[in-house]
Design a protein with these regions (language model features):
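Terminal RNA-binding accessory module
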Residues: 25-26, 33-121
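Conserved C-terminal portion of the radical SAM core fold
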Residues: 1-30, 49, 53-56
């Protein structure tokens, strides 16, 4: 239980946002296989808690980006909206047609779920 709490505290203290949470799979003849195992229902509960905290941290991070500038690599354009990622791998959309592969400087103006909205500066 303490190791789980420590993991949760690390996520909070370090403001981690891109988490890859998955249950451990026992492998025969490994030191971990000989350790006491956590029941599956507890594993699922802990994974859910960690994912929720990661999502909360991500929403807070994205909210804090509003008003900041970013560098965006345009990955695709759909119906005059350019989509890409920032230098920090956050999703950004700009309501303008920008050539795929272009790198543009933009200002973050809003967010919706996990996508930041921006305009070119």
């Amino acid at each position: 239980e303490q190791m789980f709490k420590d993991s949760l505290n690390i996520i909070k203290d370090c403001n981690l946002t891109h988490l890859h949470i998955f249950p451990y799979s026992i492998r025969k003849n490994t030191p971990a296989a000989l350790m006491p195992q956590v029941p599956k229902n507890i594993i699922k509960k802990r994974a859910r808690i960690l994912r929720e905290e990661g999502n909360r941290q991500m929403q807070e991070y994205l909210q804090n980006q509003i008003g900041n500038s970013a560098i965006m690599l345009v990955e695709k354009v759909i119906e005059n909206i350019s989509y890409g990622k920032s230098q920090h791998f956050t999703k950004i959309k700009i309501e303008d047609t920008i050539k795929e592969g272009e790198i543009v400087k933009c200002k973050i103006t809003d967010m919706n779920k996990d996508i930041l909205s921006a305009h070119i500066i």
